[in-house]
Amino acid sequence: MRLACSALTALACMFVLAHPSRAQDARSAEPFLRQVYAQYKAGGTPIDPTGPDARTIYDPALLALILTDRKAVNGEAGVLDADPICACQDYDIKTIKLSVRSKGAGRAEATASFHNLGQATVVRFDLSSVGGNWRIADIHQKGLGSLRKALADEIASAGK
């Protein structure tokens, strides 16, 4: 009886670990990012990182940093002088290439490569699953590095 229970437990563990939904988890992040970037066409209206809909794309920790930074810089541009999703102030993104890979349960890393107004741009995202939905946990881009770190550093500097 004990052997049968152990065998069933092992079989159940193998099923859970090999279940296709785990493999598809990171791939489900691509439609999320495509939806985010869909607004970055001429005439589009991307989500304001400090607006009420920001929670639909940013994870709670990054959103808290963005909102705290906004208060800390007292109306100055600061780290967010450009939109971190497109690394731009003006946009007309026509073609985007996305690659996504799993970084463990509920975490993924994505790279977006695109041309915006003739400028080749690469932006990397750390994504986290929040309530079963993908959210941006950090953004990495040339010249900025980690958005989370840049915001935290700016908040610390403003407090001095």
Protein language model annotation of sequence segments:
Residues 6-16:
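Bacterial N-terminal signal peptides
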Residues 24, 58-119:
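Surface-exposed, charged secondary-structure patches
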Residues 103-107, 111, 117-120, 138-160:
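Low-complexity, intrinsically disordered terminal/linker segments enriched in charged
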Residues 1-4:
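Positively charged n-region of N-terminal signal peptides that target proteins for export
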Residues 19-23:
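Sec/Tat signal peptide C-region and signal peptidase I cleavage site
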